[in-house]
Amino acid sequence: MSLTEWPIEVGQTLKRRRLHEMVGGAHQWGITSCMQGSAMLVFRNPKVSKKFGYDKWEGEQANGEFHYTGQGARGNQEVSSRANKSLLLSKDRGKPIHLFQSSGTDVTYLGRYKLSDNPYRWEVAPDENARDRRVVVFHLTRAQIDHVD
């Protein structure tokens, strides 16, 4: 598989371990690089979203965007943290974002996305210690894929 080929179809469900065998990336993070750093993987877990109150804003929006809360379970999230910064810089670096929904060890591919022109906003949500903190909410737009004949 070349670095430009994406082997997974929208709607396809597979084990997360198998996904990482195919394209690389970290097995446990919500945001990770893959394909030797040429793309990003983002995993949304509805159970985690509900636990931390992210479900109030996460997911598909009426305007077609997908909102995703950044990485970091304790204290204020920062856009300068490693994973959040990588996601924020993905558009400038030409890295596609491949979005998945997690359920247990299964992941379902939602599609290829990019950061919106208005890439993020701040919200308040509890951390894992039930203390309110600032979280970054990324705004993702479905990417148009150019086909070469």
Annotate each PLM feature.
Residues S103-D149:
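Compact mixed alphabeta submodule
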